[in-house]
Amino acid sequence: MAVSMRELNRATLARQMLLRREAVPAADAVRRVVAVQAQEPASPYIALWNRLDGFDPAGLDAAFASAAVVKATSLRITLHAVHAADYADFHQAMQPSLRGSRLLDKRFVPSGLTAAQAEALIGDLLEFASSPRSNAEMEAWLAGRVSGEAKAAWWALRTFSPVRHAPSGGPWTFTPRPLYVAAGIAPSPGDPALSDAALRVLARRYLEGFGPASAADLARFAL
């Protein structure tokens, strides 16, 4: 079936709730649009204000506080807000990119860790992060466990470990000084088969939020 550019445009806008504002709870809206850019604290709030009829920021505050919506490093190796029901699959799907972006980067070298040694730290790291921790606290914890620079180790680990941003105050739930907490899922092994299965879930979710779309569209969205 042929789809005109106008039809494709309108289909995408409708799926993204951008043709008209809708009366939908904040967490449900995040799930419908698949993921919301969250590099800046205000960004998810602006995104939902543009989509929701009568948007109340307190609803998104509550969703972040309860972890119904998770802010974490994910798509395109940047911070996104995603629904809790999607987080585990998205995290696993992105593992090859998240790991490669850090473990193969020269900025990881000063940590003195191998990839396997970094992997071995994740379980204890998540236990330490069972309550919110600052960058300084995480680096201090790592300082006694790595032979090199703790800052380099944490720079890598916070990207591919299942940690989320914990609310840290301010008018948009988060401040420029992030707090990290374990996301409540098991560490994602660097298993290509598991990542491929999760990528299929991500592809279906992408089509729900943006389709019709091509493989190249999905790649631009995720990578």
Which residue stretches match the model-derived regions?
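Long, low-complexity intrinsically disordered regions
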Residues: 1-223
